Structures are given as structure tokens and as C-alpha cells.
Amino acid sequence: MIIFNLRFKHNSMMRFFLLLIFLFPVITFAQPDRWQQRVKYTMNIDMDVNTNQFKGKQKLEYTNNSPDVLNKLFYHLYFNAFQPNSSMDVRSQELGKNFINGRGDWDARVRDRISKLTDKEIGYQKIISLKINGVPQPFKYHETILEVNLVKPIAPKSKVVIDMDFEAQVPLQVRRSGRDNPTTGVRYSMSQWYPKLCEYDYEGWHPTPYIAREFYGVWGDYDVTINIDKTYKLGGTGMLINANEIGWGYDAPNTELKPITKEKRTWHFVGNNVHDFVWAADPDYKHLVRKMPNGGPTLNVIYNYIENNPKNDSAWNEVADAAVIALPYMESKFGKYPYPQYSFIHGGDGGMEYPMATLISGPGLGTVFHEWMHSWYQMMLGTNESLYPWMDEGFTSYAEDLVSKFYNKKSSLQGLKETLQRNPNNKNLADLIPILPEDHSSAYAGYYALVKSGYEEPLTTHSDHYNTNFAYSNAAYAKGEVFMEQLGYIIGADTRDKVLLEYYNEWHFKHPNSSDFIQVAEKVSGIKLDWYKEYFCSTTKTVNYGIDSLWEEVGVTKIRLRRIGQMPMPIDLQLTFKDGSTEMHYMPLNLMFGEKPNENAAQKREVHEEWRWTHPTYVVEVKHKLTDITAVEIDPSKRMTDVDRKNNLLELKW
């Protein structure tokens, strides 16, 4: 009997195994019956570009589809965050006192900038009057939240009309919204610019104070009229209704802004079935238009024109061309884009998503693909980002990686390898590459860094209440993306792709939560997955498996595997033989009550008895002589988030 004990001797050599992902037709199920509140905004604002202030009138038709009597309303007043000593200001400065990896843990765009804003640079939103069905209502400010105590409650299944007059001042650009961005040069990036009704759902009201994190809105229709200096050019959510009066590429390609005698021009946008409205304005904007074939959406690219800079023009034209190429792939993987237009607008402070539009600070295609994919994972699905930021940023980052691979014809791991070739002294990257999967490799690297840091918090943490920006960003973006790729390891990549399409079909425009997603995944896969959500999202327990020992008895090789970490998983175990052939041995987890299909039809696979989660070890028996085996490896695809892979591969030399 020959025994190899690997508890103290490990082989660090790794091999990569790329699993191909194919798209399968989607399975359909009954749509969930969950009530949704409904809004219809009609707004008219008058902007003064000299004072950066505007006055607005808002008519809001609010339908209470809930079974509840509403005694209060809550509104977001986001601009009020941009004042010294605001919650956003103090929160940013407090986080900046934490030093992680030698740097202050604050958003570099915010830092302590709010504390230094002058009276003319701050933002504010003030309510002048508020009436419901003609009756004045008392209201109270809570910084970025307006509380309205109703004179008469709103009955279930009823509709009210809310009329509001308000005034606002656009803050100097600090985060997302604002004026006079020093980086982009854009005059106005107008997100979170109007008093916005908070969402009321099956959990009640969500009056979340604004500290620069996430959003949650009510589905509805927006009719927005903007009166602004006639030299300004605009882009935004929805369709421009008065395109014939405006020109500038909205009425026909390459047309100029139509001359008018009045000092202010009126722009009239309408966007239906959305939960927010964004716009941006600048006198130097240039407008590119692309039409998708076969009746698809119109694609707009609106950017700050720089005279005698053809490189800038070329980069923004590539954005337009890339969007045309990418959209069919995006729809095939994630569902149909249902709106009549989408606009990539130069503005903001990085990249920020909105219905039918995004504000991006530059023409980088990674940001372009990421923000556009937010049209699926937030704009069409509308999860509560504050509670489930990983379903927003994580799912979007997952999709971005695939779209980038499709467009660039290279995987994320290939990109990291090219980076290492350019920077051969980057030891950290050199150590990482062997343990990362072919796709979503940067996300896995981010997750492993989070685990190693000791700052990790559960994904169930409210986005505003993470103790560090470092933990929040790596959880929402990296771990959320890893959640989806690792799901493919558990149920099979092809099945996971079906899940994503069914998730879209079943839940778009319905505000799903994490349990809703898991339920869809269980229906499509036939596998129980509540354990996966609870372990990976509700705890910080980690996956760690190893090859403990192997030996031969009467021509049968036995391999003892050991679960070292606290999170159980199904196991793929690949054997490599002297002739170069391979064989997969699969141990489903007993909590799954099922098994994933063979992901590689060209490779022989044997399904073994399920591994009970209570048992730390498992002995695999294979009908091969030990001396015929040259390598044994746990999860050669490296999609399982094993935090210590040095004991996952054993190479045998005979």
C-alpha cells in the first residue's frame, strides 16, 4: 500500500481548465404576483445658469397599489447632502480616518470637499408648497429626507395627485451630480436633482438618507420640461418630444441646434416605465447617433467637444460603434433591452447608471459596458440597491466581464497575463495568476484580497453601514460578481446562463430580492440553493478544501479529501493519466438534493455519492491503479472560491 500524505507537503503547481459557456433556451415560469406602487411625474423647471439655481413645479400622480393605508409620505432631497456637516460630509471624513493598505479609506472624489463648500457652491432642495388633491400638507425636513404627515390618509388601491413647488441650487460637482466638473469640464450633471418620492414596498417605506451610496425608486412615467439658456445642449432619460424644434441630431442625423430668438430654449423629455430621470447640459456638447438595425433602440453618444482633438472624437466614436456591436450579444445573454433609446453622456465623476442613460467621465469601454449593463441589473430589475448592492454592482460586473470578453476577444485572465508581461516585477500579480479562473479573474482577486484583509463583512450588510469603503466596494462588486460565476460551478455554466435569462423574464420591472433570484435558480436547475445564499451572502465563512492523502488497495485508488474551511461545496476532482487523458469525479453536496450536469461532454465524468456537509473528510474510490495517475486536482476550473489552493493539486512522478 502506497500512501501520500499532503498535510505537510504541498505542490504549488497549478493547471488551468477552461469551461465553455453556451446559451440554452430559457425555461418559463409563472410571473410573481407582487404589487408595485406607481408614479407619474410631470415636471417643469426653469434653470438660471448664472446662479446655478432653478425653480420647479412637480405634479405627481401616485397610485397606492398596496393593501395598506398610508399615513405618511417620504421624499428624497439628495442635493441637501452637499452642505458642510451633512451626514455625507461627516461619514466621508470618518471613513477617511481608517487607513487600509497605507491609504485613507475615503472616496477620493468626496474626501473632505463638502466641508469646504461655500454658500454659492453647496446644494439644496427647498419645498415651497406641497398639496395633495388641492389640500396643503405639513412636512418636515430630515436633511436629505422630507417627511409628509398626511392630512388625509391614502387608501389602498387609490390614486392621489400631489402638486409641489420647489427651489434648488446645483452643488459644485462632488459626487455624481453637480456643476462645473474640473475633470470633464461638463457644466451640469443633473442626477438626483428633483424631490423624489421614496419607495414603499412589502417591507414598508424606505426613506434612506443619502450618504453617496445606493438608490431605490418607484416605477413610473416621467414627463420633464427643462427651460435653460439657448446655447446649452442636453441629453437625458427618455425621448426628446420636441426634437423638431431642437434639431442637433435629435430630429435627423448631423443636424445643428436650431436658432431661436428667445434667451431660453425648452427641452421636453418623456420616459416611460422607469424609476428615475437624469439629464446633463453643456454648451460644448457634440452628439453622435447610431441606429440599431431591425427596429432596435437609437444609441446616442453626447460628449464634450474639444477643438482640434481628433483623438478625443475618435474615442467617443468608438463608444458608439462598440455599443452597436455589443447590444445583440447583451440581449442574447441577459434579455431584451425594452426602451427606445440609450444615451452615453459625458458627465458625472466616473460612471453612474440611470434609466436609458449613463453619465461617464470618459470613453473607456470597460466603463461603457459596465454602466450599460446596469440597464439590466438595476434599471429593468430594480432591486433595492441599499439592501442588495451585490445584486446590482456584482451582477453588472459579472455581465461587464462577459461583454468585454466578447468585444475584445480575450478573457480577463488573458488581460492580467498581458499586464504581467508589461510589468514582470509585479510579484503580487505573478502569485495571483495561477489561482484565478479564466473569466472574472479580477473579481476573484478582489474577493481573495478582501478575505485576506480581515475587513470582510457579510453581503447582507446594508450598503450605507459597511465599516469601510474597502469592504463595501470589494463585497458589492467583486464578491457579488464571484457569487454568479461560482453559481455556475455549482449548477453548471449552461444552467446558470438559463437562470439569468429566466430571472430577467420573470422579474424585470418587479423589484426582486435575493430570495427571488435563488428561487428562479432552483426552478431552472432543479437544485436546492438556499444553503449557498446563506453561507456566501449571510456569513463570511470561506471555502477551503485539500487533498489529504491517497493510496491503492487491490487495484483501486483511494483519495481522501478534506474540508478545511467552514463553507461546504460540491467538489469536482480531475484525474490526469499517463497517456494525457483526464477524467472528472464529481461529489455533489447533500444540501443540493441534486447534481449539476456534465459540463464537458468530451470528458468522462463519474458521479459519486453525495458529500454530507457535516463530514470533514470524504474518500473517493476510482478504478485505476495509482501508478497510472499523474495528477489529482480539486476544481481545475478554479471557479470555486478556495482561499488556499496550494493543497488542491498533487502531481505524481513515477
Language model: regions and residue ranges:
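Glycine/proline-rich low-complexity spacer/linker segments in large multi-domain proteins
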Residues: 87-100, 167-222, 638-654
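Short, hydrophobic/aromatic-enriched beta-strand segments in well-ordered soluble domains
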Residues: 58-60, 77, 158-172, 222-230, ...
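Hydrophobic alpha-helical and helix-loop surface patches within well-folded domains
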Residues: 15, 38-39, 77, 269, ...
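Solvent-exposed beta-hairpin/edge-strand motifs
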Residues: 74-135, 231-232, 576-589
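Hydrophobic helix-coil surface modules that form long, contiguous segments used
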Residues: 197-204, 212-369, 398-401, 410
